[in-house]
Swiss-Prot record:
Domain characteristics, as noted in the entry: The N-terminal domain interacts with the head of the 30S subunit; the C-terminal domain interacts with the body and contacts protein S4. The interaction surface between S4 and S5 is involved in control of translational fidelity.
Assembly and binders: Part of the 30S ribosomal subunit. Contacts proteins S4 and S8.
Keywords, comma-separated and alphabetical: Ribonucleoprotein, Ribosomal protein, RNA-binding, rRNA-binding
Lineage summary: Bacteria, Bacillati, Bacillota, Clostridia, Eubacteriales
Top-level lineage group: Bacteria
Species in which this protein is naturally found: Desulforamulus reducens (strain ATCC BAA-1160 / DSM 100696 / MI-1) (Desulfotomaculum reducens)
Described function: With S4 and S12 plays an important role in translational accuracy.
InterPro entries: Ribosomal_Su5_D2-typ_SF, Ribosomal_uS5, Ribosomal_uS5_bac-type, Ribosomal_uS5_C, Ribosomal_uS5_N, Ribosomal_uS5_N_CS, Ribsml_uS5_D2-typ_fold_subgr
Family label: Belongs to the universal ribosomal protein uS5 family.
The protein, known as: Small ribosomal subunit protein uS5
Length: 166
């Protein structure tokens, strides 16, 4: 898959969570911060990244940079996704189902952030397994990577879109 040039997109950022971590050394504890950030253009492009630094703003900046490097294109069918999918990462699973227009984004915390920035307006989701934000974000991204348009599926099966949809 071709890399998406983030500089050509008008991106919005959303900090999913900030975590303070401690390294225990001889003289006590050394604190640093990790920030999970999601970026997207609201039009099918989205990315997630993790930044770590001694200060919160620096961790967020690094997270944004990482998210821009990990951008993906989400095939949308109007305001929803093209088909049902389940993303998995670690112990986290996210089930995503297309929804009728006007349903809204039915998703919790980290999953909602990704879907809104990807431009999905109507979707049903269920988070299964862990509720660790990092695993939920990565599971959602894995699921969105697996999405295919009806045209792609038809081409892979050697059929026309009409044959496929009946």
């Amino acid at each position: 898959m071709a890399r998406i040039d983030a500089s050509k997109l008008e991106l919005t950022e959303k900090v999913v969570y900030i975590n303070r971590v401690a390294k225990v050394v001889k003289g006590g504890r050394r604190f640093s911060f990790s920030a999970l950030v999601v970026v997207g253009d609201g039009n099918g492009h989205v990315g997630a990244g993790l930044g770590k630094a001694a200060e919160v703003p620096e961790a967020i900046r690094k997270g944004i940079e990482d998210a821009k490097k990990n951008m993906i294109k989400v095939p949308l069918n109007g305001t929803t996704i093209t088909h049902q999918i389940q993303g998995r990462f670690g112990a986290g699973k996210v089930l995503m189902k297309p929804a009728a227009k006007g349903t809204g984004v039915i998703a919790g915390g980290p999953v909602r952030a990704i879907l809104e920035l990807a431009g999905v307006r109507d979707i049903l989701t269920k988070s299964l397994g862990t509720n660790n934000a990092n695993n939920m974000v990565n599971a959602t991204m894995e699921g969105l990577k697996q999405l295919k348009t009806p045209e792609e599926v038809a081409r892979l099966r050697g059929k026309t879109v009409e044959e496929l949809l009946g």
